[in-house]
Amino acid sequence: MKPKIPKINQSFQFAAIENFVHLQSMVSIRLRNRHIGAYLLKQSKSTPWQLVFGFACEGIHSFLSAQEVDEVFDQVESGLKDFPANESITFHLSAFCADKDRQIRLANLVEAAPSDEVKFLLMGERQRIQELASTGLREPKNLKVYFTYTFGSSEREYADWTERALSKMENFLIYLKGDSGANQGAKLEQILKSAFNNGYLVWEQLFLNKLKLKISPLNEFELWQSLWSRLNPYSKAIEIPQLLILNEYGLQEEIHSQVHSTTLLFADSTPIADRKWVYNAGKYTSVLSFWDKPAGWKDKQQQLHYLWDIVARDLIRDTEIFCQISPANPALVRTTMQRLIKQSTTATKAADERQDVDVAAKINARRSVEAQESLYEGAVPFHTGIVFLVHRSSLDELDEASRQIENFFLRPAWVARETEVAWQIWLQTLPIVTEKLLTFGYANRRLVYLSKELPGLIPLITTFSPDTDGLELIGEDGGTPVHLDFFKSEGKHLGVFGTTRSGKSVLVSGILTHALARNVPVVALDYPKPDGTSTFTDYSNFVSPLGQYFDVSAEAINLFERPTLSSLTVEEAAMRFEDYKDFLSGCLLAMVVGIGTEEIIKTTIRTLLYCMVNNFFANPDILERYRLAELAGLGSPSWQDIPTLKDYLKFCNLTEISNLLQLEEGVDWHLVPKALEQIRLRLTYWVNSRVGRAISSPSTVQSDSMLLVFALRQVSQSEDAAILSLVAYAAALRRAMASRMSIFFIDESPILFQFPEIAQLVAMLCANGAKAGIRVIIAAQDPNTMASAGKVGAQILQNLSLRLIGRIQRTATASFAQIFGYPYEIISQCERFLPNKQGVFTQWLLDDAGIYTFTRYYPAYIQLAVVANNPDEQAIRAEY
């Protein structure tokens, strides 16, 4: 039979969680060109008002040289000494294996992608990121800083009891008159103005000028979202229920709900409190507190990285660190130290009388003396509370993760799990609680540390990411995502360096996929293998019809084909067409002059070519033929009549240029016939040669594809290869000028930079291309070839604001150190950057304007399958 359930006679008493948090309202302050948010807190009627502001902080980069570490350490130590008294600041470093933000961005890209093939590649990237997050290899880390401003209550403003009594009587009379509401509003406005002027601005200047940390103030929406996501991670934040707005017009209030904010914060999930853990939103949370610091650190770098080295481990995930500090009273600390010295001295004497040695007493005495010395030398004491929150899905996992963190700290450093008041400390980590961290009604468990010790106990280290979107790399130290965004308004050029089989092409293909998804056209200059295949053969075929792969030995590319500028404004079109004519003149100059041509002749030839280009594009008949050909399109009869190099050659005579040169100053007329003769001779050669016929005939390729790959194959002479490269550059420039943004990828060849004119054109793209929206990517095995191009090569290298260095040969290490100025201990690590077959990733050193970051690139498996170009890999792919 079914057993009967007995009656339960027990009674339980519950307390509303709203009573344990002190949020009164969200605040928005919009003064002096700033838009900041704050939490307005008040624990009870007798306690003062308090505002909590927030910063998003970049922190200190995890990869710094020894000199940079010393500078940063001294800045932090010096800045701590200027912290406002009676206030507290909380550093909150969170490390969660989450990919929600990245998945949302990629999902938006997938939706906007122009073809199913590109969507497929992006879905492969989404799958890889999901895999990395689930295994703990991808762990974004965020550093937020919360600081307080406390406005004293009316009772605390008066020291004498009679003044306090008069103040209470005044408030009572105001209440009787019915003006208490207006008085309360005026007082709130006074509090908010004082908090902004005497609180926020002070903290802002402290971070910017003293600590020299990059910060971004959080507005009311970001603060509300941050608080909501901690308590309700799986639901979308609701509108702020009650909001106070202070601007130049005064104080206003917006009410979107009659239910108080604290009640709505816990509407979706109410935390369940236990002595050892807190259960909220499907996760168990344990609390670990810091009981003692290590005996010391080897150097400043080890001290700064003390907590980072713990949280950056692969085993540590879904963990938060809170460090709250507030200035202590130096006199009280000094008195305490003196008492400890006296106690230690007494204990030592007692031990001597027993003919014994009290080691602990001697150690305490020595440390107390050192602490007093530091205080007299200017060190500032701080009350410090450090807490770790560990989140797991089950209690067994929680116990194991908590033990791991405890074991990572070696004595005398001591971190222990809370087994009695975990719920209370968890509440204290919320920015809407006025209680200090690790303070209780019956005890104050905060420790006192000096300002010279705190840099090792504040979680300030993070991995710097140049951008928030684009190509994603993973930081070698800590698994933090590092993004490179080439699609912002600020142009960036990239240099990718690495030996054969280092993964350059795979990495670049990831950038190209993101470009195609954003409808950004790409032009690539490729040097295929003898069989005609290369990395981008299969890639361009895969993304077809967006991509087209053209073998310049079999196709015709009209050097004089005009760029399509119809989508631009009149001013932009005119400016870009002038740039195109300059570039075309440079191409013609490279075709006419040789390496040994005298400089004075070269100058005259350059002048003649530019004048004739202007005359050519001003001719009405030429313009009409262009119009008809562009209107009819590729392959039409009118297209076959489009102006080419042959037509330009007709303008190369003394009659045509005599009038043009009248306006040119500094022209040596004795050299004009000789220069003109050389121009006609060389251009006639190009018109009749095999390569020349390909560039002086109407184009046979569609130049408006999103991806154009030009393959320089079956070119035996260096001069032919150079000119074909120039023609490809011209086609790339035409494509780029037709769009507001484009990418030009160059797979560097030693032949390319042997010709100064070609190197000069590449340098022009790197120097001025960003203005036209062109992002240049150059891939090479080493920088020697570019560096050997003299000033032009140096100009190219200097404009590569981003550099990725993969695996390099040991013999090339010295050249990287010499050309780029890399410290040997950093660049030498690239010698060991072998592709990891088990983890399917490659290693890269990212150089972003002198900021070094060791990273990994985890390509999507689909992306890797498309661009893999080893013979055995190509054979396997061909089977499918």
Q: What do the PLM-derived regions correspond to, one by one?
A:
Residues C57-G59, A95-C97, Y149-S153, R392-S394, ...:
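Short, flexible loop/turn elements at secondary-structure junctions
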Residues L143-F147, P521, M706, S742:
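The start of beta-strands in P-loop NTPase/AAA+ ATPase cores
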Residues S134-G136, F486, L494, V570-L628, ...:
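P-loop NTPase motor core of the ASCE superfamily
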Residues V69-P84, A328, W426-P481, Y527-K529, ...:
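P-loop NTPase motor domains
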Residues K2-V448:
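Extended, folded cores of ATP/NTP-driven motor/assembly subunits in large transport
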Residues A56-L64, H383-R392, K492-G498, G510, ...:
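Glycine- and acidic
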Residues E18-P48, A281-G282, I461-F497, L507, ...:
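The Walker A/P-loop phosphate-binding site
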Residues T348, G478-H483, F487-S502, L507-H514, ...:
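Conserved P-loop NTPase motor cores
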